[in-house]
Amino acid sequence: MFKYAIVRTPAPTLVSGITSSPELGAPDYEKALQQHRDYIRALEACNVNVTILEPDERYPDSCFIEDVAVCTPAFAMITSPGAASRKGEEDKITGVLADYYD
């Protein structure tokens, strides 16, 4: 079972992030924040230690942290997101992950 999770609080720029369903309209930022808080509570209820990163307005999709790193018990692999709006985001997670790996 997982013991640790790293999450990033959605930034207000989330509403201009990448979407595969534009017909649904822009995300509701306040609802996204509530869902994020609920997600954290659910993880904590499962006895997961949650590291919460601050929002980063430069990267609208940065709350989807799983897109920039694949983690295993032995190592973390930093990915290279294809979208131009995500370039540079991977640099921000490298330092955070270093705290979890030798």
Residue ranges and their predicted role:
Residues 1-102:
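The feature marks the mature, well-folded catalytic cores of soluble enzymes
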